[in-house]
């Protein structure tokens, strides 16, 4: 079975989808049309409800309602005293950061139409480029001086940098993700043999680029032109989001100074590398799949200072607490041992950055923001429902492994009946918009959607495997 991966950037509009089309209301819980679609489309559905027909859509709806009912049934027994979930705390804070950035950064983006026109003129070119990436600023300055003196790009690469070959890349308008690099190539028209640079990239390396050649492919039909224009606008918006995000982060972190304790840092980096390589504990090659608790390692003391922030000391215990709710995220994929120390440092700096964003979000009451709470409720109800399910299985002498291996057997012999009893019990409190359900169209393609570069990459919880019944003989039919 092929599963398609749908990558959703954190800045993508999906994260901020506002949906007032209520499909189901149960007490204070709601399931919207958008909830139904993303819970169905952005994770893997069981075979018994993969299609778009009415029977399968009703099974999906029953499953989502069952998840809410299980969560409601158990919520009175859950408190901070008997249940603390760092995963849910982390999910909530991730949504808080998302909506903070949406409001203070992304919603204010307005790209000049004249700038868009300049990009459109160059967006149909595909370049063959030579490039060199220089980590050292003094070396980059020297190269810039040599170019200013009229020395050829190739001669600099051969005689001054001792390169045996010059790296090459083919680049179209939609390839590059670094705003500075993209702007240097596509904002203005470039000619063959033109050299540009130094361009300061996001990884703080200095790029020099020479145009080897390019191909211009004009569009013919009005549909091609319209589609391409929309794609260019979307690409420019995404690049501008990255640029404005960087500006905002630079502003809020300008008075923050982090100094790492080198001895302790080396120990932690070694432990993190072993955890990453030996256990392969990365999701999508970037996010650690579970919290690495440094203070439980024999070589590390719980109270060792790992860094100072603005002169204040923070120990390994503090770092563990942060990581427990915010798994480390690495900027790069396929990290070698040689570069792991630097990538580990970046991951810690990004962790501190996100904690600063959390501080601003809490200060501005994003912990009680309606949109944050709605999105968080999807994950919290899914988690509570899972706790309820595990308790049910245990009380009826089923193991979780048994259920995962053959869920339909347990659903048929036990769970359907239990879910039926909850549906009957809450029937007067359940309102369903069947007209809206009938309008929904689904695909039968297996997709797994995730966001890149965040501690919790899943867009939605896994599909709730709780019932395979399509009959809806409970609740009240309404049009919200």
Predicted feature residues:
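Hydrophobic, helix-prone linear segments
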Residues: 1, 17-25, 29-41, 47, ...
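Sec-dependent N-terminal signal peptides
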Residues: 3-14
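N-terminal targeting/tethering segments
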Residues: 18-104, 108, 295-402
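FKBP-type peptidyl-prolyl cis-trans isomerase
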Residues: 20-43, 69, 74, 120, ...
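Stable alpha-helical elements in mature extracytoplasmic
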Residues: 32-40, 56-61, 65, 70, ...
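Peptidyl-prolyl cis-trans isomerase
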Residues: 50-54, 85, 143-186, 197-204, ...
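Acidic/polar surface patches and capping/hinge elements
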Residues: 100-130, 145-149, 398-440
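Extracytoplasmic and endomembrane cell-envelope/extracellular-matrix remodeling and assembly machinery
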Residues: 214-223, 246-306, 325-327
């Amino acid at each position: 079975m092929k599963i398609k991966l749908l990558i959703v950037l954190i800045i993508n509009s999906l994260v901020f989808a506002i949906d007032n089309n209520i499909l189901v209301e149960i007490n204070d819980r709601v399931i919207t049309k958008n909830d139904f679609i993303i819970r169905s489309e952005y994770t893997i559905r069981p075979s018994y409800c993969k299609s778009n027909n009415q029977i399968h859509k009703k099974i999906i709806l029953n499953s989502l309602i069952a998840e809410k009912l299980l969560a409601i049934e158990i919520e009175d027994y859950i408190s901070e005293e008997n249940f603390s979930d760092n995963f849910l705390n982390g999910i909530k804070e991730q949504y808080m950061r998302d909506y903070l950035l949406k409001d203070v950064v992304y919603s204010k983006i307005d790209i000049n139409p004249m700038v868009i026109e300049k990009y459109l003129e160059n967006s149909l070119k595909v370049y063959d480029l030579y490039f060199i990436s220089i980590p050292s600023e003094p070396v980059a300055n020297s190269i810039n001086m040599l170019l200013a003196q009229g020395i050829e790009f190739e001669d600099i690469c051969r005689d001054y940098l001792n390169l045996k070959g010059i790296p090459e890349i083919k680049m179209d308008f939609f390839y590059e993700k670094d705003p500075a690099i993209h702007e240097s190539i596509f904002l203005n028209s470039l000619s063959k043999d033109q050299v540009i640079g130094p361009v300061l990239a996001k990884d703080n390396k200095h790029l020099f680029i020479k145009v080897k050649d390019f191909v211009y492919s004009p569009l013919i039909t009005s549909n091609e032109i319209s589609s391409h224009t929309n794609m260019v606008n979307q690409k420019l918006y995404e690049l501008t989001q990255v640029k404005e995000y960087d500006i905002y982060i630079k502003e809020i972190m300008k008075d923050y100074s982090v100094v790492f304790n080198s001895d302790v840092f080396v120990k932690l980096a070694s432990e993190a590398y072993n955890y990453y390589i030996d256990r392969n504990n990365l999701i999508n090659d970037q996010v650690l799949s579970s919290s690495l608790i440094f203070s439980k390692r024999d070589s590390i003391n719980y109270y060792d200072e790992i860094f100072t922030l603005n002169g204040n000391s923070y120990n390994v215990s503090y770092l563990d607490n942060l990581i427990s709710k915010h798994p480390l995220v690495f900027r790069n994929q396929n990290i070698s041992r040689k570069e792991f120390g630097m990538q580990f440092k970046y991951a810690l700096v990004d962790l501190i950055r996100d904690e600063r964003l959390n501080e601003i979000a809490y200060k501005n009451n994003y912990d009680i923001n309606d949109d944050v709470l709605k999105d968080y409720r999807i994950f919290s109800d899914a988690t509570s429902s899972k706790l309820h399910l595990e308790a049910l299985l245990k009380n009826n002498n089923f193991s979780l492994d048994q259920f995962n291996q053959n869920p339909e057997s347990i659903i048929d012999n036990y769970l359907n009946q239990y879910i039926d009893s909850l549906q009957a019990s809450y029937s007067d409190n359940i309102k369903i918009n069947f007209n809206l359900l009938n309008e929904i169209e689904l695909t039968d393609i297996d997709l797994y959607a995730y966001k890149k570069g965040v501690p919790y990459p899943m867009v939605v919880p896994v599909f709730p495997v709780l019932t395979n019944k399509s009959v809806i003989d409970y609740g009240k039919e309404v049009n919200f």
